[in-house]
From Swiss-Prot:
Protein name: tRNA dimethylallyltransferase
Lineage top rank: taxon: Bacteria
Cofactor(s) demanded: Mg(2+)
Entry GO MF terms: ATP binding; tRNA dimethylallyltransferase activity
Signal peptide (from-to): none
Sequence similarity: Belongs to the IPP transferase family.
């Protein structure tokens, strides 16, 4: 018998079939679902996020879906707080939290905690944005390369959201984002060595993806085409028509949305939009695989297998998560 209550992480790249498997598991286990997806938190963004259907959500409710307006921001710290609260409620009812999604930073934050980063500073952000307008984003990236070369190596000059945050952390705290994270890693290692855990649950880690990467690429392309057929452009048009949303917001920078937004701005033809949307989704999947390859104690399932439910249940039984 485990001393800590059980939880299940179901991870994987985009278009791998995570939602379907999570629903199948919840049919046979006393599970309640928690979404781990930085785009599914937003209302009115259904098609481009491949959000579970209204019928699915009615029958199999997911926590942390449709909790924010697209004008709002949502951080890994926000997710960790919300997820821990939801997990505690689910556990108190005698059920198992099943966390499903592909935002690997959220899973990592939940499992290991977060570095004690400084809060957002409106004045610093305004100055950085003004500098970017005056001198270009490459200039800001050059500044970051001086104070935090590790972050500069992983943040593209055309990623203003992450670029501003990295410089903001340095200017507010005097410490680079990399230094903050190294400090957190050291604290986590020390806690683990002393027997303490950041997440007070016994976690079983499942991941699902096609064994053949080409199959995943085909699924990504097909799903993007299906989204367009389902009215993805109209969905983004509705967001634009509000008048208070813009391309710099985290919600609109989500994969697919930023390409459609650029198309509606006249920057991309429909063909270019579709091609870039598919490429961006494939790049997202590649980043997700990079995270997953470094994950400890991960049990893989093949998206194309017909017996994933039984395989998942067998694994969960083997690690005593169902005891």
């Amino acid at each position: 018998m485990n001393a800590l209550p059980p939880a299940i992480f179901l991870m994987g790249p985009t278009a791998a079939g995570k939602t379907d498997l999570a629903i199948e598991l919840s049919k046979v286990l006393p599970c309640e679902l928690i979404s781990v997806d930085s785009a599914l938190v937003y209302r009115g963004m259904d098609i481009g996020t491949a959000k579970p259907s209204k019928a699915q959500l009615a029958e199999f409710p997911h926590r942390l879906i449709d909790i924010l307006d697209p004008a709002q921001s949502y951080s890994a710290a926000d997710f960790r707080s919300d997820a821990l609260a939801a997990m505690a409620q689910i556990t108190a009812r005698g059920n198992i939290p099943l966390l499903v999604g592909g935002t690997m930073l959220y899973f990592k934050a939940l499992l290991d905690g977060l570095a004690d980063m400084p809060a957002a500073n409106a004045a610093v952000r305004a100055q950085l944005e003004a500098d970017a307008q005056a001198f270009g984003w490459q200039s800001l990236h050059d500044q970051l390369a001086v104070v935090d070369p590790v972050s500069a190596a992983r943040i593209h000059p055309n990623d203003p959201q992450r670029l501003i945050r990295a410089l903001e952390v340095y200017r507010v705290s005097g410490m680079s984002m990399t230094a903050h994270r190294e400090q957190q890693t050291a604290q986590s290692t020390e806690a683990a060595a002393s027997g303490c855990q950041q997440l007070p649950y016994t976690v079983a880690n499942l991941a699902i993806a096609p064994a053949d990467r080409k199959v995943l690429h085909q699924r990504i392309a097909l799903r993007f085409e299906q989204m367009l057929d389902q009215g993805f452009l109209d969905e983004v048009l509705a967001l634009r028509s509000r008048g208070d949303l813009h391309a710099g917001l985290p919600s609109i920078r989500a994969v697919g949305y930023r390409q459609v937004w650029d198309h509606l701005d006249g920057k991309l033809t429909r063909e270019e939009m579709q091609e870039r949307g598919i490429i961006a989704t494939r790049q997202l999947a590649k980043r997700q695989f990079t995270w997953l390859r470094s994950w400890d104690d991960l049990h893989w399932l093949d998206s194309l297998a017909s017996d994933n439910l039984s395989r998942a249940l067998k694994y969960l039984g083997s690690v005593s998560i169902l005891s």
